[in-house]
Amino acid sequence: MQLGVIGLGRMGRIVVDRVLDAGHEVVAFDLSAEAVAAAADAGAEPADSVADLVDRLGDDKRIWLMVPAGDAVDATLDDLDPHLDGDDVVVDGGNSHFEESVRRAEACSAAYLDCGTSGGPAGAELGFSLMVGGPQWAYDELTPVFDAVATGPDGHGHMGDSGSGHYVKMVHNGVEYALMQAYGEGFELLAEGRYDLDLESVAKTWNNGAVIRSWLLELCEEAFREEGSDLGDVDDHVAGGSTGTWTVQEALEQEVPVPLIYQSLAERFGSRADDRFSRRLANRLRYGFGRHEVARKDD
């Protein structure tokens, strides 16, 4: 299969590499000529514009967007749409709001798949978890690509109609917030409690057979190993928050109580005002799973 990939940042480059490794062809474009050259060195066919990328694809075009959510998606679609028809498929693999994905699907000349992507930079080796919404036929058509980009056939699923993939990913991120908050509070109690504990050792022990073992807990272990049990100079300012806000807003609209997700979001916003150990751990965990910049106390 031939796939066009637009957006060659951390996540987009992983898509390119995994699709190439699976034996498919990739045509790659990014606003950064350096990123395009690097993808070409890895085996992708370089394109110097969106129009050039489209010209290099066959009649039934399959195009994966991995650009920042918001205006960048709309701008890219504006460039693409004149070249597309109903036999083509476009995948938005970014963190778009599900309602925006529904709007784009209705306006796009091609079949439009909204694909929630989870796994962070670790997906380069392990593969991603992919939550896909949109036409069933388009999902089926892209299955070989999803198999390559995901952890395997069980690492992706068709969630339903347009918007459902990004909807499920939105809720996934809300759950992620709550899990980070729970781990943060637990380790804060251990750090401030009555025993002098090696928190790396605690996390390592929990990761081997405990009910609460998880990849996030493995990242806690990594954080304590690299920063120390007191987290060193890691600040308690936790960035992000948009997808958690969307989750809480949707819960209010659907009249579904989500107190844990709401409280974790409130703590994240509160991190811009005072200092707590739990938020410092959340700050460091965001580096672990997404390689987001770690705010330091002397920054």
From Swiss-Prot:
Positions that bind NAD(+): 7-12, 67-69, 95
Database matches in SMART domains: 6PGD
Claim: Phosphoprotein is one of the keywords in the record: no
Active site: 169 (proton acceptor), 176 (proton donor)
Record note on pH: Optimum pH is 10.5.
InterPro entries documented for this protein: 6-PGluconate_DH-like_C_sf (IPR008927), 6DGDH_YqeC (IPR004849), 6PGD_dom2 (IPR013328), 6PGDH_archaea (IPR032883), 6PGDH_C (IPR006114), 6PGDH_NADP-bd (IPR006115), NAD(P)-bd_dom_sf (IPR036291), Pgluconate_DH (IPR006183)
Catalysed reactions, as listed in the record: 6-phospho-D-gluconate + NAD(+) = D-ribulose 5-phosphate + CO2 + NADH
Pathway: Carbohydrate degradation; pentose phosphate pathway
One of the record's GO molecular function terms: NAD+ binding
PANTHER family found in the cross-reference section: 6-PHOSPHOGLUCONATE DEHYDROGENASE
Protein name: 6-phosphogluconate dehydrogenase, NAD(+)-dependent, decarboxylating
Organism: Haloferax volcanii (strain ATCC 29605 / DSM 3757 / JCM 8879 / NBRC 14742 / NCIMB 2012 / VKM B-1768 / DS2) (Halobacterium volcanii)
